[in-house]
Amino acid sequence: MHDADIQLCDNADRHRFELRVGGEVAAFSEYNAVKGALLFTHTEVLPAHEGEGLASRLIAFALDEVRRQGLHAIPACPFVAAYIRKHPEYLDLVREAGRRAFLK
């Protein structure tokens, strides 16, 4: 798989960020828009693409979009929460009251 085959987008109609490989959805992260934030609820990689690092790539894109839009991230999805723990450069996207959970 080449980077040229990968497309990342915010599919706002379906309330999810998508990563497509060759035009087909390979991974997605669902969210709900809440006041000033995106609440991430579920991230999934299709079985044919597991182990390729696509979920991490997708979440980095999603969190960059959250930052670009001036929003906060609410990581209810365990994968998104774990990603933020491993990448503290995104910790500022979590509202201050919720950051304690990431500082353990």
Where are these regions (language model features)?
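Structural motif
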Residues: 11-13, 34
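Conserved beta-hairpin
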Residues: 15-26
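Residue-level recognition of conserved beta-strand positions in structured domain cores
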Residues: 21, 42-43
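Conserved beta-strand in the GNAT
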Residues: 24-32, 39
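C-terminal structural segments of small proteins and small subunits
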Residues: 68-103
